[in-house]
Amino acid sequence: MARPRHLRGLGMCITAVLASFIAGFTVGWFIKPLKETTTSAGYHQSIQQKLLSEMKAENIRSFLRSFTKLPHLAGTEQNLLLAKKIQTQWKKFGLDSANLVHYDVLLSYPNETNANYVSIVDEHGVEIFKTSYLEPPPDGYENVTNIIPPYNAFSASGMPEGELVYVNYARTEDFFKLEREMNINCTGKIVIARYGKIFRGNKVKNAMLAGAMGIILYSDPADYFAPDVQPYPKGWNLPGAAAQRGNVLNLNGAGDPLTPGYPAKEYTFRLPVEEAVGIPNIPVHPIGYNDAERLLRNLGGAAPPDKSWKGSLNVSYNIGPGFTGSEYSRNIRMHVNNINKITRIYNVIGTIRGSTEPDRYVILGGHRDSWVFGGIDPTTGTAVLQEIARSFGKLVNGGWRPRRTIIFASWDAEEFGLLGSTEWAEENAKLLQERSIAYINSDSAIEGNYTLRVDCTPLLNQLVYKVAREISSPDDGFESKSLYESWLEKDPSPENKECPRINKLGSGSDFEAYFQRLGIASGRARYTKNKKTDKYSSYPVYHTIYETFELVQNFYDPTFKKQLSVAQLRGALVYELADSVVIPFNIQDYAKALKNYAASIFNISKKHDQQLRNHAVSFDPLFSAVKNFSEAASDFHRRLTQVDLNNPIAVRIMNDQQMLLERAFIDPLGLPGRKFYRHIIFAPSSHNKYAGESFPGIYDAMFDIENKADPSLAWAEVKKHISIAAFTIQAAAGTLTNVL
């Protein structure tokens, strides 16, 4: 019986890979002994240099210009047309396959006939002030249609009315301050919070837990306006009428809210919308800082507790609740009329078949959808991905082929909760867990123009450093230096000043399902701002209509050299992972990281030294497991350096041990309340999805433990998660031992 079309997914994309597996594997592994000589090592390096020199800044510029002319929101016709354009180009570049893979997911849009806004109402219910509905279009885009107005996707609909309370960034600690120290109750109130510091979905969750009946989000100039820079279009700062779009889900890795854990195909069972995962039950709406100033101007109540609660608007930043003076009797009313509907989205999946190990995959993926034009997010990443695919295609057309299969992915609906990438990961989980070497993310290539930023698994640290040394720095004053040298000088690691900083992976982009759920080694790289001096959040015009091609060309990267460096780094990582005989992971770096993370979580626990003794909580099993892992890693590294490269079975065994190590840190039961976050060593912070947390089970169990109702139960939970972490690390160490 023919396989149903809708079940093909990855299989449709790599039919040639699987069909040639027996021949390729047999010929590559068993008939021809591997000849790893100086010549072949030199050949490997020469191909990498060809790849890097093939990439051109002007091509990235052209792709960015082409892809940002029109809005391409997930689920729209324009984004499908862009998917087809990318598919056509990949085929032209010489990829072996390029296919559209669709899913039917829940998306959220504003009501076209019933606008979202916030108003101030008098004692008679008359609206005396209304926030703006649209952002003024930038120069040259006045006639562009289908621009979605600012909104927060998946906000509940409704018209709550009540007193206003200012809650700073709506972080957990902000609500603790209000409730525990200032005795301010947010129950039944509408709260207003600044964007920044944490993921907006966490802000909404915190507001719900505090009992608020609605939350207004705005970008304060203190967080989104750099000193001495003009607002767009004269500079790259945020105009006062601009508002940041974004989803406010708390999916915790679930993917499509109606099909958590399973791909959203035609045959899939769906939850009723009222049972959908992660959707807030209160209205949420974003506004610009001009409108926010009007709402905050006459807030009464307590003064801000300290200067960290004050932004840069010309207001007192009083907390409320409610207004003072002539506006004493007035309230806030929210009008939110979003519509949630099941919508078809499209990923583009392309492949270059591996010559020797076609059943081993290296994935390079980035999202295509944007809120409006996507000048930075994501289309600098899309343009970079396109140039990498073109350059690999050029090598293939010249007769080269990677040792392992390379999969290119253009994801849809990332802005709606990482949906396209997660659904594809769910549909192909069994294949990916068995065969994937690594996932490299290709979201925005820039978020600033100061230096490189890398977040990755410790397995990739040394490879990142290696390829960064082989790429020229694009930075002014470093013309004869490498990317590694400029990165090291500008952002050294706080733990080791002799190496550049590499961050832990959190979430917020499409690597999430691959790393946090499936345990596939993952990494991301982009150019960023100077975090020591630039205190604004993200980049000022993030997720607004002013993210245009001109923003990038005129201000962020006029030469496109920063994006070229990112393309070369991402491309070189993919090349090394796909074509090196021995997978270029460094397991000893994982051992060092575990040692540091164990010491860090233990130091946090020392704040509760007496309680640790009272409840007989010991970290000894964790330290013992880390020690055993370190010894196993050292022994594995020794054997890896001695492996007979002419023995393909020996190489394959050790490569598989490396490939599967990240998988060994996966707990099938997941973290408490977050079952799709299954990595025991790393997870997004429970209080900020964007940030990575180490030993998240232990950390979450200890968070605010002094205020838990039952201390014995709370400390028992800490013991449990120390035990889980110790077991997992010990089991991972076991996977590194010599094969019997």
Swiss-Prot record:
<keyword id="KW-0482">Metalloprotease</keyword>
<dbReference type="InterPro" id="IPR007365">
    <property type="entry name" value="TFR-like_dimer_dom"/>
</dbReference>
<feature type="binding site">
    <location>
        <position position="262"/>
    </location>
    <ligand>
        <name>Ca(2+)</name>
    </ligand>
</feature>
<feature type="topological domain" description="Cytoplasmic">
    <location>
        <begin position="1"/>
        <end position="7"/>
    </location>
</feature>
<keyword id="KW-0325">Glycoprotein</keyword>
<dbReference type="GO" id="GO:0006508">
    <property type="term" value="P:proteolysis"/>
</dbReference>
<comment type="subunit">
    <text>Homodimer.</text>
</comment>
<dbReference type="GO" id="GO:0046395">
    <property type="term" value="P:carboxylic acid catabolic process"/>
</dbReference>
<feature type="binding site">
    <location>
        <position position="543"/>
    </location>
    <ligand>
        <name>Zn(2+) 2</name>
    </ligand>
</feature>
<feature type="glycosylation site" description="N-linked (GlcNAc...) asparagine">
    <location>
        <position position="628"/>
    </location>
</feature>
<dbReference type="GO" id="GO:0004180">
    <property type="term" value="F:carboxypeptidase activity"/>
</dbReference>
<feature type="topological domain" description="Extracellular">
    <location>
        <begin position="32"/>
        <end position="740"/>
    </location>
</feature>
<feature type="transmembrane region" description="Helical; Signal-anchor for type II membrane protein">
    <location>
        <begin position="8"/>
        <end position="31"/>
    </location>
</feature>
<feature type="binding site">
    <location>
        <position position="259"/>
    </location>
    <ligand>
        <name>Ca(2+)</name>
    </ligand>
</feature>
<feature type="binding site">
    <location>
        <position position="200"/>
    </location>
    <ligand>
        <name>substrate</name>
    </ligand>
</feature>
<feature type="binding site">
    <location>
        <position position="443"/>
    </location>
    <ligand>
        <name>Zn(2+) 1</name>
    </ligand>
</feature>
<feature type="binding site">
    <location>
        <position position="426"/>
    </location>
    <ligand>
        <name>Ca(2+)</name>
    </ligand>
</feature>
<keyword id="KW-0121">Carboxypeptidase</keyword>
<feature type="glycosylation site" description="N-linked (GlcNAc...) asparagine">
    <location>
        <position position="143"/>
    </location>
</feature>
<keyword id="KW-0378">Hydrolase</keyword>
<dbReference type="GO" id="GO:0008233">
    <property type="term" value="F:peptidase activity"/>
</dbReference>
<feature type="glycosylation site" description="N-linked (GlcNAc...) asparagine">
    <location>
        <position position="111"/>
    </location>
</feature>
<dbReference type="Pfam" id="PF04389">
    <property type="entry name" value="Peptidase_M28"/>
</dbReference>
<feature type="binding site">
    <location>
        <begin position="542"/>
        <end position="543"/>
    </location>
    <ligand>
        <name>substrate</name>
    </ligand>
</feature>
<feature type="binding site">
    <location>
        <position position="247"/>
    </location>
    <ligand>
        <name>substrate</name>
    </ligand>
</feature>
<feature type="binding site">
    <location>
        <begin position="689"/>
        <end position="690"/>
    </location>
    <ligand>
        <name>substrate</name>
    </ligand>
</feature>
<keyword id="KW-0472">Membrane</keyword>
<feature type="binding site">
    <location>
        <begin position="507"/>
        <end position="508"/>
    </location>
    <ligand>
        <name>substrate</name>
    </ligand>
</feature>
<dbReference type="GO" id="GO:0050129">
    <property type="term" value="F:N-formylglutamate deformylase activity"/>
</dbReference>
<dbReference type="GO" id="GO:0046872">
    <property type="term" value="F:metal ion binding"/>
</dbReference>
<dbReference type="GO" id="GO:0016805">
    <property type="term" value="F:dipeptidase activity"/>
</dbReference>
<feature type="active site" description="Charge relay system">
    <location>
        <position position="618"/>
    </location>
</feature>
<dbReference type="InterPro" id="IPR036757">
    <property type="entry name" value="TFR-like_dimer_dom_sf"/>
</dbReference>
<feature type="active site" description="Charge relay system">
    <location>
        <position position="656"/>
    </location>
</feature>
<feature type="glycosylation site" description="N-linked (GlcNAc...) asparagine">
    <location>
        <position position="185"/>
    </location>
</feature>
<feature type="glycosylation site" description="N-linked (GlcNAc...) asparagine">
    <location>
        <position position="603"/>
    </location>
</feature>
<feature type="binding site">
    <location>
        <position position="377"/>
    </location>
    <ligand>
        <name>Zn(2+) 2</name>
    </ligand>
</feature>
<feature type="binding site">
    <location>
        <position position="423"/>
    </location>
    <ligand>
        <name>Ca(2+)</name>
    </ligand>
</feature>
<dbReference type="GO" id="GO:0009056">
    <property type="term" value="P:catabolic process"/>
</dbReference>
<keyword id="KW-0645">Protease</keyword>
<feature type="active site" description="Nucleophile; for NAALADase activity">
    <location>
        <position position="414"/>
    </location>
</feature>
<dbReference type="Pfam" id="PF02225">
    <property type="entry name" value="PA"/>
</dbReference>
